[in-house]
């Protein structure tokens, strides 16, 4: 037990704790998130393997959480979130370890840590686990606009939106995009 942290593995019973950490992390990052009902359906309806939730707690409080999806011997850390003020306690390390341990318990031979930009701090973190990069290629048949100039302002704006309003926007955007 590192810094008094404990990892708990489960399914639907951990959904509220997972979503609390996920949504707060998304807000800290200044990004849009998926609505809670998306994860409810994922946890309850995933039929291609296992869908497991892992929650890391400090003194009973959820401070890190992740979703593990398995399919045909492969496991993917599909969503991963920690509360920033607890990061000095190495929450992400315990969370990854617990997700990997669960993938191994389920008989998976491959574990994916999710996407990251080459050279980014997240990518460097993942390289500590002796990972092998698998490049992703994106193709488009139309000219793409570079939103990078708007992104810093949008991030700051999203951080200011109250959580209940952000959840409504997330649900609306999810319906339009997916």
Feature locations, PLM:
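Short, intrinsically disordered/low-complexity patches at protein termini
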Residues: 41-43, 87-88, 100-101, 145-147, ...
């Amino acid at each position: 037990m590192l810094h008094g942290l404990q990892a708990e593995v489960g399914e639907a019973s951990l959904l509220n704790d997972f979503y609390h950490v996920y949504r707060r992390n998304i807000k800290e990052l200044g990004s849009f998130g998926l609505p809670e009902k998306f994860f409810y359906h994922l946890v309850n309806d995933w039929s291609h393997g296992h869908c497991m939730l892992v929650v890391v707690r400090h003194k009973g409080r959820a401070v890190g959480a992740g979703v593990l999806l398995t399919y045909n011997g492969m496991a993917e850390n599909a969503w991963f979130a920690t509360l920033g003020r607890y990061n000095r306690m190495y929450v992400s390390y315990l969370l990854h370890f617990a997700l990997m341990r669960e993938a191994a318990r389920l008989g998976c031979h491959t574990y994916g840590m999710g996407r990251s930009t080459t050279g980014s701090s997240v990518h460097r973190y993942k390289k500590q686990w002796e990972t092998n990069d698998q490049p992703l290629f994106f193709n488009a048949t139309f000219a793409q606009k570079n939103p990078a100039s708007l992104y810093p302002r949008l991030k700051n704006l999203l951080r200011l939106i109250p959580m209940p309003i952000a959840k409504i926007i997330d649900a609306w955007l999810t319906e339009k995009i997916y």
